[in-house]
Design a protein with these regions (language model features):
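Parallel beta-helix/beta-solenoid repeats that form elongated, surface-exposed shafts/blades used
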Residues: 29-49, 55-75, 79-94, 98, ...
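Surface-exposed, low-helix, low-complexity loop/repeat segments of extracellular attachment proteins
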Residues: 1-58, 66, 216-226, 235-242
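Edge beta-strands of jelly-roll/beta-sandwich modules across compartments, strongly enriched
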Residues: 261-269
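Surface-exposed ligand/attachment interfaces on beta-rich extracellular proteins
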Residues: 29-42, 91, 138-183, 190-202, ...
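Short beta-strand-to-coil "C-cap" segments at the C-terminal boundary of structured domains/repeats
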Residues: 269-275
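Periodic small-residue-enriched repeat registers in elongated scaffold domains
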Residues: 57-173
Length: 275
């Protein structure tokens, strides 16, 4: 069976849409219901707009109606986007505000602004984290790649902790480890004076962190290896330091400024995560 079920203005179909069911070859086994924008212009976009879009508490754009079970999952976060259609637990959804799951299976984006592009068994549980996995050993997130972007501002020789949201470090904004995990991290830090400035500060580190049960167990395994250290001009005293945060259970990236200047700092923490 194939054919047009409705066109704009007829059979209850909104103007500007063509809805067609295709069940002939090659769609005999899995039929396709096509919704096509029909505009008077040469090309036409198709927008799916949740109620409240453009506000802080806008609705989510989702592939299924939540049912609080593993079938369709829990309610999604405000302004979230979730195209994942298969899971084995109700929590495997984009439940964080502004979180995104592009597809795949058994993924969870629970942190605010967190992203899982696809794949299988990835968990992005902290602020702005990107996670990717191709499967897991026993539970989602126990074999994955993660990336978190941190930032902060120093004025003069002050010190500041770089965090994902630019505020004080917490249990969700400082490249936090999951319980029972080891993170092998590559940390790249850069800073400059905003505007047309020649000031350049770059540091690159590698380090291994372990967290058992509870934030207080977070620790460095071995030392921190400094791979790159660039400061231009040479008389800058700006520097970055890496340590374990046993209060919030994460990776602490601390920036120290240089006299007489304001520096904007950015940092990527890339982590190979296993548990």
């Amino acid at each position: 069976m194939s054919g047009i079920l409705g066109t704009g203005g007829g059979s209850g179909t909104p103007a500007g849409l063509v809805i067609a069911l295709q069940e002939t070859a090659p769609n005999v086994t899995t039929g396709v219901l096509a919704i096509t924008a029909s505009t008077t212009t040469a090309s036409g976009s198709l927008a799916l707009v949740p109620k409240g879009a453009g506000t802080l508490a806008g609705g989510a754009l989702i592939a299924q109606v939540p049912d609080a079970t593993a079938t369709a999952g829990n309610v999604r976060g405000a302004n979230a986007v979730d195209w994942q259609s298969y899971r084995v637990a109700s929590t495997q959804v984009a439940s964080g505000a502004y979180a995104v799951i592009g597809g795949g299976t058994q993924n969870a984006a629970t942190g605010q602004f967190a992203t899982v592009a696809g794949g299988s068994g990835a968990v992005a549980a902290t602020y702005g984290k990107f996670a990717m996995a191709s499967g897991s050993f026993a539970s989602p997130g126990d074999a994955q790649y993660g990336c978190t972007v941190l930032r902060g501002i120093t004025t003069g020789t002050t010190q500041v902790r770089l965090t994902a949201d630019g505020t004080a470090p917490s249990a969700t904004n400082t490249a936090n480890l999951q319980d029972g995990h080891v993170y092998a991290a590559r940390i790249l830090v850069a800073a400059t004076v905003p505007g047309d400035s020649p000031v350049t500060v770059v540091y690159e580190f590698t380090a291994v962190f372990r967290r058992r049960t509870g934030a207080q167990t977070t620790m460095l395994v071995g030392g921190v290896t400094e791979i790159t250290a660039i400061t231009d001009p040479d008389d800058l005293t700006a520097m970055a330091d890496i340590s374990a945060d046993a209060v919030n259970g994460g990776i602490a990236v601390t920036a120290t400024g240089s006299a007489g200047i304001t520096l904007h700092w950015a940092c990527t923490v890339q982590s190979t995560e296993v548990g």
